[in-house]
């Protein structure tokens, strides 16, 4: 699942820089911004059949590739 | 009695807070006293006015709506979009009526009978809750917590805009003495900072600069006069509102609540994007989370456009225009919203241009200073629009008997 998530991040952001450091802050590095974050939400919702409401997306919990993977896993486990 | 407006108010508030401070230091929340305090201060603020009925009526109305939607969405587990939109519309209806009322009853008379101090801000709280119930983030709305959240006294007049889940989490958490001591410390400091901002700096700017220059600019508009009034107003707006926010946050801190902040050195913003992450943050983030992001997500999911640029531009327009309308239905509030939308759209376009042309602009003290300077001035132009001074200038030209600005 992690690989699938990272592939989606790569498609949405157009870069695979984050793979070098899965804990780099994607927003600070300009890899993600508000728009791409929403694209990411839409893709992740579709791929894993989960619900990701924008107001829940606390940047502190979603700003690295590892954190995103963890959040998706949590959501999947909830269902 | 207006909140935070007279020394007498602060004395009473200070005395009233002492039991809560002592209780918290002893590890107790004293919820019954907090509720009593809220009722007492609401009474002090609203009694003797007709608006107290609007305040109570509004609370009853919103409780019915929110509890209904909780029953519908959680108990019945239904999620029809049309019910959601209907409930949202009902929730904002009192606010819309209050804002539209002056169009039908222009002039200095009393506003809509539905209006009361803080209606604009409380409405944000209920609308956000309805959206989060829809999203499944809020699964229960306990009545007592809901009412306390809605009527939470320190922030009732102008925010900061808090969020239900955050507030309830804090409400339920036990008192941790070290944390409270830290909060107490910060709270007291913030109240003093608020005093400095609102009653000293803001007051001086108004008394010795803004008040006079606004009148001069209205009667004898010139580039110099108008620019001066622009800076005076913008600085006054900041110190006055940031001061109020510090009071609200500081008092909440004393009661044990770590409320989110409203301002973070906004005049150091390097670009308009940065600015909206520093200025009236609780409002900005509310609009971002509950308007912009939802709208953009809907566009993408429903595939109304493939063009990301178009989607974000429309998103900015809708977001900022709504914010303009929320301030009031005057041409200058709406223009204020539109202008900020243009700034956001323009800034994105500038970023794309730099990327396309591969311009590598160095990041040093000088370029930072220039970006801050440009952003500062673009933002202050928006404050000038917002102040209504241009409106006064135009109206004064048309009719010299039109009332002068009275800041």
From Swiss-Prot, chain A:
The modification O-(pantetheine 4'-phosphoryl)serine is found at residue 34. The keyword Cell wall biogenesis/degradation applies. Pfam families: PP-binding (PF00550). Residues 1-76 form the Carrier domain. Pathway: Cell wall biogenesis; lipoteichoic acid biosynthesis. One of its GO terms (biological process) is cell wall organization. One of its GO terms (molecular function) is D-alanyl carrier activity. It is found in: Cytoplasm. Keywords: Cell wall biogenesis/degradation, Cytoplasm, Phosphopantetheine, Phosphoprotein. InterPro entries: ACP-like_sf, DltC, PP-bd_ACP. GO terms for cellular component: cytoplasm. 4'-phosphopantetheine is transferred from CoA to a specific serine of apo-DCP. Its main location: cytoplasm. Belongs to the DltC family. Carrier protein involved in the D-alanylation of lipoteichoic acid (LTA). The loading of thioester-linked D-alanine onto DltC is catalyzed by D-alanine--D-alanyl carrier protein ligase DltA. The DltC-carried D-alanyl group is further transferred to cell membrane phosphatidylglycerol (PG) by forming an ester bond, probably catalyzed by DltD. D-alanylation of LTA plays an important role in modulating the properties of the cell wall in Gram-positive bacteria, influencing the net charge of the cell wall. This is D-alanyl carrier protein. It comes from Lactococcus lactis subsp. lactis (strain IL1403) (Streptococcus lactis). The lineage of its organism: Bacteria, Bacillati, Bacillota, Bacilli, Lactobacillales.
């Amino acid at each position: 699942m992690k690989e699938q998530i990272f592939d989606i991040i790569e498609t949405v952001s157009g870069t695979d820089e984050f793979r070098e450091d899965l804990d780099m802050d994607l927003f600070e590095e300009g890899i993600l911004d508000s728009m791409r974050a929403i694209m990411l939400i839409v893709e992740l919702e579709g791929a894993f059949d989960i619900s990701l409401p924008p107001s829940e997306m606390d940047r502190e919990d979603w700003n690295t590739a590892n954190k995103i993977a963890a959040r998706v896993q949590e959501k999947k486990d909830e269902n | 009695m207006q909140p935070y407006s007279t020394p007498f108010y602060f004395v009473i508030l200070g005395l009233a807070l002492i039991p809560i401070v002592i209780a918290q230091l002893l590890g107790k929340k004293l919820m019954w006293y907090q509720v009593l305090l809220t009722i007492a201060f609401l009474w002090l603020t609203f009694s003797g006015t007709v608006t107290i009925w609007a305040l109570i009526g509004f609370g009853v109305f919103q409780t019915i709506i929110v509890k209904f939607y909780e029953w519908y969405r959680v108990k019945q587990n239904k999620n029809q979009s049309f019910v959601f939109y209907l409930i949202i519309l009902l929730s904002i209806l009192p606010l819309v009526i209050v804002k539209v009322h002056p169009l039908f009853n222009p002039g200095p008379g009393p506003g809509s009978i539905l209006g009361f101090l803080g209606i604009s801000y409380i409405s944000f709280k209920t609308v956000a809750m309805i959206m989060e119930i829809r999203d499944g983030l809020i699964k229960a709305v306990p009545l007592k917590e809901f009412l306390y959240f809605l009527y939470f006294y320190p922030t009732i007049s102008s925010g900061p805009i808090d969020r239900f889940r955050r507030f309830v989490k804090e409400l339920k958490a036990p008192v941790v003495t070290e944390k409270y001591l830290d909060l107490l410390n910060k709270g007291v400091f913030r109240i003093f900072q608020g005093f400095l901002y609102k009653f000293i700096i803001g007051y001086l700017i108004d008394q010795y600069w803004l008040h006079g220059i606004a009148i001069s600019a209205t009667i004898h508009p010139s580039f110099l006069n108008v620019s001066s009034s622009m800076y005076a107003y913008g600085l006054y707006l900041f110190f006055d509102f940031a001061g109020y926010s510090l009071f609200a946050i500081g008092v909440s801190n004393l009661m044990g609540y770590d409320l989110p902040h409203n301002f973070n050195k906004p005049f150091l913003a390097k670009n308009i994007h940065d600015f909206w992450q520093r200025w009236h943050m609780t409002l900005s983030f509310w609009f971002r989370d509950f308007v912009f992001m939802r709208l953009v997500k809907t566009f993408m999911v429903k595939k109304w456009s493939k063009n990301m640029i178009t989607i974000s531009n429309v998103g900015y327009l809708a977001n900022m225009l709504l914010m303009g309308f929320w301030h009031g239905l005057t041409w200058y509030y709406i223009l204020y919203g539109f202008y900020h939308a243009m700034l956001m759209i323009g800034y994105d376009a500038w970023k794309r241009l730099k990327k396309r042309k591969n311009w590598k602009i160095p990041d040093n003290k000088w370029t930072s200073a220039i970006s801050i300077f440009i952003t500062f001035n673009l933002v202050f132009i928006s404050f000038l629009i917002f102040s209504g001074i241009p409106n006064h200038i135009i109206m004064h030209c048309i009719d010299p008997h039109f009332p002068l600005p009275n800041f």
